[in-house]
Amino acid sequence: MKLLSPLDQMFARMEAPRTPMHIGAFAVFDLPKGAPRRFIRDLYEAISQLAFLPFPFDSVIAGGASMAYWRQVQPDPSYHVRLSALPYPGTGRDLGALVERLHSTPLDMAKPLWELHLIEGLTGRQFAMYFKAHHCAVDGLGGVNLIKSWLTTDPEAPPGSGKPEPFGDDYDLASVLAAATTKRAVEGVSAVSELAGRLSSMVLGANSSVRAALTTPRTPFNTRVNRHRRLAVQVLKLPRLKAVAHATDCTVNDVILASVGGACRRYLQELGDLPTNTLTASVPVGFERDADTVNAASGFVAPLGTSIEDPVARLTTISASTTRGKAELLAMSPNALQHYSVFGLLPIAVGQKTGALGVIPPLFNFTVSNVVLSKDPLYLSGAKLDVIVPMSFLCDGYGLNVTLVGYTDKVVLGFLGCRDTLPHLQRLAQYTGAAFEELETAALP
């Protein structure tokens, strides 16, 4: 038996029909040369027969709200692994529409919290795979690592198959819960003590992430949402991002944040809704995880420089804030980071459950998260991975999410928005590309 961490429990409790709390990704593969007509169906049957998903994807949530735990079960492959088809010839637009519908549908919380869809019918000798899992069962980095475990750099290798980790039945549930309660209480006291000493200094001085959170303006991104999702995609070349980062002594992530900030500035100007205060983003930072921790990420709030017209000045402001924010988080112990994440998520979770989140002031405007899949090409049973697009979750007051994944020589940005409250989401993706080009022109000699 394994307990859900406080942060994992928070994500489970935030689940609601309008705001499903799963994250996911879809990937497009090139069929191998000479692949038979049954290739995709054979792949579907092979995946259905593999016990390739480790803990907690072989488990369901059990126990009460105060001490939830994972109970191991035998997943039904015919339920979790599905074969779908687009009307041939399926286009990228057709695939996007299907994935939007799949991502809008909540998971069944009474079953293991994941689904995998193989999708045939694409033109150009391609097929797609869509995977989603609840955020209480996986974070962004964990999800990418899981997908990576199915793939290989060897075009001839079969699908990866991890062996499930048995929990065993030889335990006394009452004793385990009692020990866990004591352990959590001790950890909580220790974390509060550490955080009390750090938070006072985090508020002071220039580039404070805490003060940035308290001055976040309300925008069209920060409204009540429904369950219907819209996806937009932008692809940036990694060598070009690195060149700008090197020339400005910043990180690639800073360059992307500045590009997204420039896009938001233009987007909101066109809507007549650009606030005086700069927009802010929640930027996750991973930390060391133990065997019982699924979500091992905290985060800080960084300005996006939407009040700054000059793209290089915008980047400089963002870099100063992210440098301080990352340093402050990395100086904390993993225990303190876990509780810091819970404290930061608590007002969002309470607002979500009470219905007040759409009207109370936001702590940030949206999240921008970044993970790396692989620098090398990857394959699934000989089918080369062409592109992977990440997709996160939304909740009331936070109707936009931007997730990045690095693969080979490109970075793919997935913009997830509420279909009915965020108009023209594709423009935001397009403007991000244009804002990067503007920054590149200004930064490089």
Swiss-Prot record:
UniProt-annotated catalytic positions: 135 (proton acceptor)
SUPFAM superfamilies from the UniProt entry: CoA-dependent acyltransferases
Biological process terms in GO annotation: biological process involved in interaction with host; glycerol metabolic process; glycerolipid biosynthetic process; response to hypoxia; response to nitric oxide; triglyceride biosynthetic process
GO molecular function: diacylglycerol O-acyltransferase activity; O-acyltransferase activity
EC annotation from Swiss-Prot or TrEMBL: 2.3.1.20
Domain of life: Bacteria
Keyword hit for Lipid biosynthesis: yes
Catalytic activity: an acyl-CoA + a 1,2-diacyl-sn-glycerol = a triacyl-sn-glycerol + CoA; di-(9Z)-octadecenoylglycerol + (9Z)-octadecenoyl-CoA = 1,2,3-tri-(9Z-octadecenoyl)-glycerol + CoA
GO cellular component terms attached to this protein's record: plasma membrane
Entry keyword annotation includes Lipid biosynthesis: yes
Keyword annotations of the record: Acyltransferase, Glycerol metabolism, Lipid biosynthesis, Lipid metabolism, Transferase
Associated pathway: Glycerolipid metabolism; triacylglycerol biosynthesis
Enzyme class: transferase
Induction or repression: A possible member of the dormancy regulon. Induced in response to reduced oxygen tension (hypoxia) and low levels of nitric oxide (NO). It is hoped that this regulon will give insight into the latent, or dormant phase of infection.
Homology family: Belongs to the long-chain O-acyltransferase family.
Function, in words: Catalyzes the terminal and only committed step in triacylglycerol synthesis by using diacylglycerol and fatty acyl CoA as substrates. Required for storage lipid synthesis. Upon expression in E.coli functions weakly as a triacylglycerol synthase, making triacylglycerol (TG) from diolein and long-chain fatty acyl-CoA. Has very weak wax synthase activity, incorporating palmityl alcohol into wax esters in the presence of palmitoyl-CoA.
Protein's recorded name: Putative diacyglycerol O-acyltransferase Rv2285
Organism: Mycobacterium tuberculosis (strain ATCC 25618 / H37Rv)
